[in-house]
Structure formats: C-alpha cells, structure tokens
C-alpha cells in the first residue's frame, strides 16, 4: 500500500493527549508512515472507510518481557507478540529480559521455574553478574531492532542493575542503544545504587524500579528508603508485580517522588485504582502509564492492555478516553520516544476499534465503560496495515473497508 492513505468516516477520534483526548475531526491522512493531515479529505490512492468506528493511537505496553523472537519460554508459547498486536498494541517497552533460560536466574530458593532449573544443577549466581546482564541487554537490543512480529515496535534496550558495574559499563551500554536501567533484584549496597543512578542520569539512561514488596538494596531494610535513594524516573508496576509495595511506600512515591507511576494488568487492581485516584486528586494523571507485565509467570494475555483500561474505568471515575492516554501518549512521553499520539508529524501507528458485534453499545468508549469487549478491525504500524479484519474469535460491529483508487493517468496516455 504505497502513497497517501486517507481514513474517513471516523466516528470518534482519540488523540492520546490528556490535554484534548478527543479530536473534532472525521478524517486522518497518512503518508510515508507519518500522520500528515487531520480533518481534511484530499484525494488519496487508498481510502480506509471506518463507517463510524473509532480511531485511536495503537496502545503502548510499558511493561513487557520480550524473549528471543516471538517465543515465551516460561509459558512455552509461540506467537504471544503477534496476538498482542492483533489486540491493539503497536509498541512494547521491555521491562528487562528477566527470564531467559539459563541466562538470568534470580534465586535458587524462589519457588518457580528458575528455582527448578537451579535444582537441576544450574548455578544461578553465574548468570547474575554485571558482564552477563550487560551482554544480554545488548544482545536483546540488537535482536529486536530487526525482529518485528506483525510490525511491532519493541524497545528492548533495558539492562538490570547488578553488583560490579563500573562507569565504563554505562558508557558502553549507552553507546549500544541501552536506554533504561532497571533495579530488579536487590544489589548489595545502597551507595552503589546511588552511584549507578548518577551514571544513568549522566549518560541519558532512564531509571526504573521493580516496585514491589522488597527493598532494592540488601543493606537497607526499608523499601521506601531504597526508592528514595534510587529516585526512579519510572516506578515500575507500582501496583505490584504481582505484590505491591507497602501502602506508605506507594503513597510516598505519589506525594514526594517525581516518578511516572506504572500500573500493570497482573498487579493489585485496588492499589492501581488508589494510585489513579490520588494522581487525579493531585492533577497529575500525566504521571500514570499502563502495562501488562506479560508474558511471565502469570501467563499470556494478549488483550491485557484494553482489559486494564476497562477494569480501571470500572474502579475509578477516570473516563476511558483519559485512560487511553495512559496507554499511549503518556507512555511515549515518559520514555522520551516519538508516537503514542494522533497528531500531525507523529508515526502512523493507529487502531480502528468498535464494540463487539452483539454489544448493546454502539461506540468504543461507551462499550469499554459499559464492560463489553471491543475489538480492532484494522491495525496500522508506521503507515502499513498489519492487520485487517479480525483474526480473533469475535468481530467488531463495523469493520473498516479499504478502497484503492486507480492511479491518475499521465497526460497523453490512452
Ligand atoms: Zn515485570
């Protein structure tokens, strides 16, 4: 599909921007992979008629765990990324490659598959050193630059903090495209955490914490004190992955930290609703971003992003169009990346949504608020239609149609 593409008959146009989440326009022109015009209807080689359905920026999953290619070893599942894209997600942010078999084993005592592997003769300490975690982060970054199942954008450049890093490691990581340092498992000393934090800031790496029920360093018992020392840019799964931090640490992050507050599908949804309400009271909804924390021990849920939006709409007064911003524009901005918005000049990563066929509702926003399922009928990434029609079991009410206009004949030709 080359040349300009015009989306027309858009019923509801969502922008991904909290300042004006719904745009007063019925058309969007895409060319060269980029949104060129909004609200105009010029001639275009390809016209996509939405028949009144909703057009929105593709969702960003701010907390995904990519492995190699589209295989998830913990679930022994192929195709999780492709199914995630078909469910309306166009961008994945890696929260770290934490579960590569044999490459990063958190603990021989944890009651999970990694402990099982350690029990069979593996040495978990061996995979837990600065050299190994750095090599893995660089390898994943390289691999996901070219591996794009269904065209997905996957930012895989996340490295775990480990004991033993020196400043040159950070220089090397930054030069190799690593964009985020994540405190995942406790490192030994809080002084090292503070040093890593300053190197990350110096070299332009974002800092994310595994925000849960354990301290980030071994020499500090208080979860809150370790969070204070690390001063994260992003408090990863502040509602737990799966168990949240104590409420006083969560409230400290909201009231005194400056971090983006990430809420994930697999966490504690009551705590997520609490964070959302507090952020709304503080007029700080721009700090909230949404993710899945999948695939992982909890399973593979390709529709997790929409489901999280829906559940949070039931548990709070925040309208669906604002929750969509937390899964699109907010995330792009927090990660300092382009996209997540329906705006001129932004990448054309777009999804056409409509209520499931049998729903009593007739509009995507009403459908999600009501509690029915909505489905994408068309998904575009970088101006390329990667899915049309619905390969999932159920269909949206209004399926977009694609019309190709014959190219204009050159003057003088017959
Ligand atoms: Zn995670």
Predicted feature residues:
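N-terminal metal-binding scaffold of metallo-dependent hydrolase/deaminase domains
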Residues: 1-42
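Metal-associated gating/positioning segment near the N- to mid-region
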Residues: 44, 50-135
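Active-site mouth loops of central-metabolism enzymes
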Residues: 62-75, 153-166, 185, 212
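Short, acidic/polar
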Residues: 73-81, 162-173, 218-226
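Active-site core of metal-dependent hydrolases
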Residues: 120, 176-299, 316
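C-terminal cap of metal-dependent C-N hydrolases
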Residues: 348-401
């Amino acid at each position: 599909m080359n040349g300009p593409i015009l989306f027309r008959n858009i019923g509801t146009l969502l922008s991904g921007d909290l300042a004006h989440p719904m745009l007063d326009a019925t058309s969007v022109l895409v060319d060269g992979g980029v949104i060129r015009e909004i609200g105009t209807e010029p001639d275009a080689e390809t016209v996509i008629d939405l028949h009144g359905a909703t057009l929105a920026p593709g969702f960003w999953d701010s907390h995904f765990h990519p492995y190699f290619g589209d295989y998830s070893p913990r679930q022994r599942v192929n195709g999780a990324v492709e199914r995630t894209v078909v469910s309306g997600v166009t961008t994945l942010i890696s929260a770290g490659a934490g579960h590569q078999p044999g490459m990063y084993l958190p603990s021989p005592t944890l009651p999970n598959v990694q402990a099982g592997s350690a029990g069979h003769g593996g040495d978990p300490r061996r995979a837990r050193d600065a050299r190994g975690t750095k090599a893995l982060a660089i390898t994943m970054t390289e691999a996901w630059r070219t591996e794009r199942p269904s065209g997905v954008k996957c930012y895989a450049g996340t490295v775990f903090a480990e004991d033993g890093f020196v400043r040159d490691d950070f220089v090397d990581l930054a030069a190799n495209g690593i964009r985020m340092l994540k405190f995942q498992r406790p490192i030994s000393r809080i002084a090292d955490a503070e040093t890593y934090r300053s190197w990350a800031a110096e070299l332009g790496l974002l800092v994310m914490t595994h925000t849960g029920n354990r301290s980030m360093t071994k020499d500090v018992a208080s979860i809150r004190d370790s969070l204070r020392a690390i001063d994260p840019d992003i408090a990863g799964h502040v509602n737990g992955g799966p168990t949240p931090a104590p409420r006083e640490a969560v409230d400290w992050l909201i009231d005194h930290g400056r971090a983006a507050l990430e809420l994930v599908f697999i966490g504690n949804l009551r705590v997520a609703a609490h964070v959302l309400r507090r952020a709304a009271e503080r007029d700080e909804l721009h700090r909230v971003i949404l993710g899945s924390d999948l695939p992982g021990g909890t399973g593979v849920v390709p529709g997790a992003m929409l489901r999280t939006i829906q559940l949070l709409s039931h548990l709070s007064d925040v309208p669906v169009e604002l929750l969509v911003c937390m899964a699109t524009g907010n995330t792009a901005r927090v990660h300092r990346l382009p996209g997540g918005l329906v705006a001129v000049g932004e990448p054309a990563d777009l999804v056409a949504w409509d209520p499931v066929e049998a729903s009593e509702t007739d509009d995507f926003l009403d459908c999600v608020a009501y509690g029915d399922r909505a489905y994408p009928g068309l998904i575009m990434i970088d101006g390329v239609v990667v899915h049309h029609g619905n390969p999932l079991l159920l269909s949206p009410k209004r399926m977009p149609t694609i019309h190709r206009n014959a190219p204009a004949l050159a003057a003088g030709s017959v």
